Amino acid sequence: DQSLRVLQSLGAVLVNIELPCSFGDFRNAVSAVASAEGYATTCELIDQEHLPLDQHVRRRMLAGRDVSAKDYLHSMREMNAWRSTFRELMKEFDALLTPTGFTTAIPASEVDEMVIPAYYTRATNILELCALALPNGYGPDGLPTSLCIHGHPFAEATVLRIGWALEQATIEEKRQPRGLI
């Protein structure tokens, strides 16, 4: 909320919008496509069990072997429909602002290698947008929070200008959060 107030003070006009779907709706479509394409790209390495490869990466990539052509094509059609809908919705706006993640950063010791915390950022990839994740404060636990600025395809300059303005207007004490490593 503080970041939004700062952007408003800099002249940004903020509008709450209702999205045509939830960010959670993207999960299954992305999972099918990313798994299938990831496996197709790396199968020569993934299938050779004697090669040294992180077990979590291997397990995630192997999931793509079981994605059917039907599921893959259905997910691609779904993603294309979302792209059209969002491009129409975004015509009136320079950017979409969301948190970068559901939570503050977590200590490295608590990272679950099988969980990809990409609830909001996953949409950026599906919708072929550009985005900038910008640290914007600290949660009650003292760990960093982040704002994600999503922009139109190839509108990196706009997204970077918004991020630069926000960063320059928020002088935050620079500190390294405790307990991350």
Predicted regions and their residues:
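Structural helix-boundary/capping segments
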Residues: 1-10, 67, 73-77, 84, ...
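General small-molecule cofactor/ligand-binding pocket signal
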Residues: 13-18
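Short, surface-exposed loop/helix-turn segments at secondary-structure junctions
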Residues: 28-33, 73-74, 103-122
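Short helix-loop capping/hinge segments that flank enzyme active sites or metal/cofactor-binding pockets
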Residues: 32-87, 133-144
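Small-aliphatic-rich amphipathic alpha-helix that forms the alpha element of a beta-alpha
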Residues: 87, 111-135
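Glycine-rich, N-terminal phosphate-binding loop of Rossmann-like dinucleotide-binding domains
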Residues: 100
